[in-house]
Amino acid sequence: MTVILERRESESLWGRFCNWITSTENRLYIGWFGVLMIPTLLTATSVFIIAFIAAPPVDIDGIREPVSGSLLYGNNIISGAIIPTSAAIGLHFYPIWEAASVDEWLYNGGPYELIVLHFLLGVACYMGREWELSFRLGMRPWIAVAYSAPVAAAAAVFLIYPIGQGSFSDGMPLGISGTFNFMIVFQAEHNILMHPFHMLGVAGVFGGSLFSAMHGSLVTSSLIRETTENESANAGYRFGQEEETYNIVAAHGYFGRLIFQYASFNNSRSLHFFLAAWPVVGIWFTALGISTMAFNLNGFNFNQSVVDSQGRVINTWADIINRANLGMEVMHERNAHNFPLDLAAVEAPSING
């Protein structure tokens, strides 16, 4: 009888834990995805802060030339970064216990792998947690779908691209200048500016900013005034009120006359779907573009594509970009390569005699 009572108490304790994890009454929803999200993001954040402040230089290229990235080793907020794991490690899983010592682990850039892998797990679980909370509240699942765009972008630069290039040393450094360096080198090696998927991403980000500004300014300009002239119009809104807070007909009429009638939405639901879908689809395409360029399916190459009747090349902007790419590539990892990859890949002329 005592055993049965203990089992019931144990089940009751587990049941209470499950109810607490999945309760929507908590100030912050945890959820089953949160059980994994919280420790992974805490780990990634803690190691990032410590490494950004105090990590020793990392031999990123695997040629015994360490690169400093932390504040205590001479960097500032702009130049500092978590240096990617060494090319000597490649794609190997490199936890602390795989190194002979902590000093070796730090020298080979172990913190980068630790941060990136925990971060990707954490943001994926955050996306799952968004879906989980929506499900519990009876909401539609599109918040998690929208968040999948930045998750896909992060996975592309931190995981897919290193896999395609064969080393975590090719991943994006975790810092401001390191991000810019990654962008410049990516352009030099893959001509991303001439890739249609990147163009769609630019349209998505800048278009999304434009549409967001247009929508916000239109709504703010067509608020239904509930206050006197001496009070802020914002004070006329009560959280949870049933009445519309702005006049969509007035906004529709204004914008329809500013451009033309059918350029303006007359359905609030389709308008907000468009505002969400435009940047999300654009960022999806950019992440897909990064993931294909990871395996060297690069941007368009229109170099020397225009010639005159004598066969002489007439330079276009494509040739100017190509010249810039070669310049950036020859300066990249200058001690690791004697020539840019494009030049080194040219077949050597045959020698007779």
From Swiss-Prot:
Pheophytin a binds at Y126. Keywords: Acetylation, Calcium, Chlorophyll, Chloroplast, Chromophore, Electron transport, Herbicide resistance, Iron, Magnesium, Manganese, Membrane, Metal-binding, Oxidoreductase, Phosphoprotein, Photosynthesis, Photosystem II, Plastid, Thylakoid, Transmembrane, Transmembrane helix, Transport. The chain crosses the membrane at residues 29-46, 118-133, 142-156, 197-218, 274-288. Its EC number is 1.10.3.9. Chlorophyll a ChlzD1 binds at H118. GO terms for molecular function: chlorophyll binding; electron transporter, transferring electrons within the cyclic electron transport pathway of photosynthesis activity; iron ion binding; oxidoreductase activity, acting on diphenols and related substances as donors, oxygen as acceptor; oxygen evolving activity. It holds the Pfam family Photo_RC. CDD domains: Photosystem-II_D1. GO terms for cellular component: chloroplast thylakoid membrane; photosystem II. The record marks Y161 as: Tyrosine radical intermediate. The D1/D2 heterodimer binds P680, chlorophylls that are the primary electron donor of PSII, and subsequent electron acceptors. It shares a non-heme iron and each subunit binds pheophytin, quinone, additional chlorophylls, carotenoids and lipids. D1 provides most of the ligands for the Mn4-Ca-O5 cluster of the oxygen-evolving complex (OEC). There is also a Cl(-1) ion associated with D1 and D2, which is required for oxygen evolution. The PSII complex binds additional chlorophylls, carotenoids and specific lipids. It is found in: Plastid, Chloroplast thylakoid membrane. Its main location: plastid. Fe cation binds at H215, H272. GO terms for biological process: photosynthetic electron transport in photosystem II; response to herbicide. A quinone binds at H215, S264, F265. The record marks A344, A345 as: Cleavage. The modification Phosphothreonine is found at T2. The modification N-acetylthreonine is found at T2. Photosystem II (PSII) is a light-driven water:plastoquinone oxidoreductase that uses light energy to abstract electrons from H(2)O, generating O(2) and a proton gradient subsequently used for ATP formation. It consists of a core antenna complex that captures photons, and an electron transfer chain that converts photonic excitation into a charge separation. The D1/D2 (PsbA/PsbD) reaction center heterodimer binds P680, the primary electron donor of PSII as well as several subsequent electron acceptors. 2 of the reaction center chlorophylls (ChlD1 and ChlD2) are entirely coordinated by water. Herbicides such as atrazine, BNT, diuron or ioxynil bind in the Q(B) binding site and block subsequent electron transfer. PSII is composed of 1 copy each of membrane proteins PsbA, PsbB, PsbC, PsbD, PsbE, PsbF, PsbH, PsbI, PsbJ, PsbK, PsbL, PsbM, PsbT, PsbX, PsbY, PsbZ, Psb30/Ycf12, at least 3 peripheral proteins of the oxygen-evolving complex and a large number of cofactors. It forms dimeric complexes. Belongs to the reaction center PufL/M/PsbA/D family. This is Photosystem II protein D1. It comes from Vitis vinifera (Grape).
